[in-house]
Regions:
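Active-site glycine/GP-rich loop and adjacent strand/helix microenvironment
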Residues: 1-207
Length: 207
């Protein structure tokens, strides 16, 4: 009703809500592709894989609403700023006048480009609670090559996972979002709970 009443062209939304909005429109025989919405700045959930392709959630939205442009963001309350995609959709751009970002390993040393690291920030525009090398706990890649849009600042990948949530399973390491993408890709799975525990041998098990 609000969309039809005020005719917005852009919205800021959690991607999962877009899925619910699409389902509501289909259930009520509303053609959401003809509404005024053309772009959405998405918060709270990842839309893309590290190679910039849409993940399962992003694909589901794009398939149902192909005319809607989806822009990913990365932000936190502590930053009071965000990394936001441009129209090239190749990672979130750093705003260097607002924040300094580092990507650190477990020893607090900078990782090499192409290696995942913990996003660590120093705020420049926050007066009430400035932060120096604040560890977010989020693991991301950094991209340093110039973007096709013309900007040459560091860009940020989608979040691979939380540092404390890394799972060691059958000789490899992974983060919960990788499991969620697999489950989200199964049409008949609507809701799920993933349980991870350590067995008697000291290795992780996934249910």
């Amino acid at each position: 009703d609000t969309i039809h009443r005020i005719h917005p062209t852009c919205g800021m939304v959690v991607p999962s809500f877009l899925i619910k909005l699409i389902e509501f429109a289909e259930k009520n025989q509303i053609d959401h592709n003809t509404c005024s919405m053309k772009k959405c700045v998405c918060i709270g959930e990842a839309l893309r894989n590290p190679d910039f392709t849409l993940n399962t959630l992003g694909q589901r939205i794009s398939e149902k609403w192909p005319s809607l442009q989806l822009y990913s963001t990365y932000a936190s309350t502590e930053m009071q700023s965000s990394f936001t995609e441009c129209s090239e959709f190749h990672g979130g751009h750093l705003q260097p006048e607002l924040i300094i970002v580092e990507f650190l390993d477990d020893k607090n040393l900078p990782v090499k480009v192409g290696e995942p690291g913990e996003v660590t920030i120093t705020t420049l525009g926050v007066e009430g609670m400035p932060l120096l090398r604040f560890k977010t706990g989020d693991i991301c890649y950094q991209y340093t090559e110039p973007c096709a849009c013309g900007r040459n600042t560091i860009r940020l990948s989608s979040v691979l996972g939380r540092k404390g949530q890394m799972i060691k399973y059958k000789g490899t390491t992974l983060y919960p979002p990788a499991l969620f993408d697999i489950l989200d890709d199964i049409p008949r799975v609507k809701n799920y709970v993933v349980e991870v525990y350590t067995n008697k041998l000291g290795t992780d098990e996934i249910l």
